[in-house]
Curated annotation (Swiss-Prot):
Protein name as annotated: Putative multidrug resistance protein MdtD
Pfam families per UniProt: MFS_1
PROSITE patterns documented for this protein: MFS (PS50850)
Entry annotated with the keyword Cytoplasm: no
GO cellular component term, pick one: plasma membrane
């Protein structure tokens, strides 16, 4: 990219800045949850909603981000995303109650939902096609560093300052990013078709109320009647979307996507698989601190091997899939992740703390292989005219399933521990043991979906098929 103009390189730095902010925020909060609970006078069982409110908002807003960027302009939307994210960070730091914090996290989520997809769109518009891959590698690298720094930085700030600083550090960064966006980024627009507002609202209502209903009486204090009503509203909203999208060329997500078998299987497997995987980044630092008595900083450091394992495995995923095929890889990694989850619980409860970094490194390797395989399986056979829509739907499902996973993890803690989870409680480790056993079972379930993937589905087979279809 050395032959790119200086202005373009600065624009890529701005996008990379946004990727870093968004990825850092998704991991820095996890380590701080026990301290937040103590500061706000809440049970740790309720703190999963701090993550859910952000991730669910991202899932809801993702479908609108690309259309808004084309309609209003990439600079205007990227600037708005940074401003909303920064304001949300400020309001998070100023929150005095859990409800205030949840609303502020939702505002952060609106900004986070627009930051990454609009950043990708910006790169497509400012960089020549032949340099697009190199440019995307450059801007996504900080996004890979964010999860590496997030847990340890969050623990460090909590231990030596306060949890408020995990949000306050976003403010100067956000101000610089917003000013740089206005000064340096061009405002590309495109002629757009009419936005499917009806479909967007139906999906948003369905996802939001079903997740809220899943949290149930343990997290929200809702009555059984209210929960039943939410489930009914959510199901009706999703059914209405299916009726709305049928034979509708302007639907937010075309039902024609599901005519491709690998897309249907991959999407179902991604949804179920990420529910299980979404539990782990939330539960691991909470367990280390509340269940084992680790300090926030120590718990954050323990998460680094998992990220390193994930980053290291990405280099050889393609060779693994080409050698063994999608079905074998996905079934093996799904069952393997379940076994590693049990291994982590066992070594932790036995007090073999020196083994935990190796177990977490292995967990990161297995999880990364499964994530990459799920993503490529889902999208690889889609025709070109449906590829963009399929990618957007997959991104939305990824965020939604992660929020559901965190919700279920909180629900399991509440189910086994009622309101008595604390470092001083004699039953705490028993509560976590039952929770981790349940998580391992849930993580293993998607293997039944992946077992239905055609046996000849390899990366190289898919490429040859795509070439034949293009001829």
């Amino acid at each position: 990219m050395t032959d790119l103009p200086d202005s373009t390189r600065w624009q890529l730095w701005i996008v990379a800045f946004g990727f870093f902010m968004q990825s850092l925020d998704t991991t820095i909060v996890n380590t701080a949850l026990p301290s937040m609970a103590q500061s706000l006078g809440e049970s740790p069982l309720h703190m999963h909603m701090v993550i859910v409110s952000y991730v669910l908002t991202v899932a809801v807003m993702l479908p609108a981000s690309g259309w808004l960027a084309d309609k209003v302009g990439v600079r205007n939307i990227f600037f708005t995303a940074i401003v909303l994210f920064t304001l949300g960070s400020l309001f998070c730091a100023l929150s005095g109650t859990l409800n205030e914090l949840l609303l502020a996290r939702a505002l952060q989520g609106v900004g986070g939902a627009m930051m990454v997809p609009v950043g990708r769109l910006t790169v497509m518009k400012i960089v020549p096609r032949e340099q697009y891959m190199a440019a995307m590698t450059f801007v996504t690298l900080p996004g890979q560093v964010g999860p590496l720094l997030g847990p340890a930085l969050g623990g460090l700030l909590v231990e030596y300052a306060s949890w408020h600083w995990i949000f306050l550090i976003n403010i100067p960064v956000g101000i610089i990013g917003a000013i740089a966006t206005l000064m340096l980024m061009p405002n590309y627009t495109m002629q757009t078709r009419r936005f499917d507002l009806s479909g967007f609202l139906l999906l948003a209502v369905g996802m939001a109320v079903l997740t809220l209903a899943l949290d149930g009486s343990k997290g929200t204090g809702l009555s059984p009647l209210a929960i039943t009503g939410l489930v009914a509203v959510g199901v009706v909203a999703l059914v209405l979307y299916l009726l709305h999208a049928r034979n509708n060329n302007r639907a937010l997500f075309s039902l024609k996507l599901f005519r491709t078998r690998t897309f249907s299987l991959g999407l179902a497997g991604s949804f179920a698989g990420r529910i299980g995987s979404g539990m782990l980044p939330f539960m691991t630092p909470v367990f280390l601190q509340i269940g084992l008595g680790f300090s926030p900083f120590h718990a954050g450091l323990m998460m680094i091997p998992m990220v390193l394992g994930s980053m290291g495995m990405k280099r050889i995923v393609v060779q693994v899939v080409n050698r063994f095929g999608y079905r074998r890889v996905l079934v093996a990694t799904t069952l393997g992740l379940s076994l590693v989850t049990l291994l982590f619980m066992t070594t932790a409860l036995l007090g073999w703390y020196y083994v935990l970094p190796f177990v977490l490194f292995l967990q990161g390797m297995v999880n990364s292989t499964r994530f990459s395989s799920m993503n490529t399986l889902t999208l690889k056979d889609l025709p070109d005219n449906l590829a963009s829509s399929g990618n957007s739907l997959l991104s939305m499902i990824m965020q939604l399933s992660m929020s559901i996973g965190v919700t279920i993890a909180g629900l399991l803690l509440g189910l086994f521990g009622s309101q008595h989870v604390s470092v001083d409680s004699s039953t705490t480790q028993t509560v976590f043991m039952y929770t981790w056993l349940s998580m391992a079972f849930i993580i293993a379930l998607p293997a039944f979906i992946f077992a239905r993937v055609p046996n000849d589905t390899h990366q190289n087979v898919a490429i040859s098929r795509r070439k034949r279809s293009a001829q």
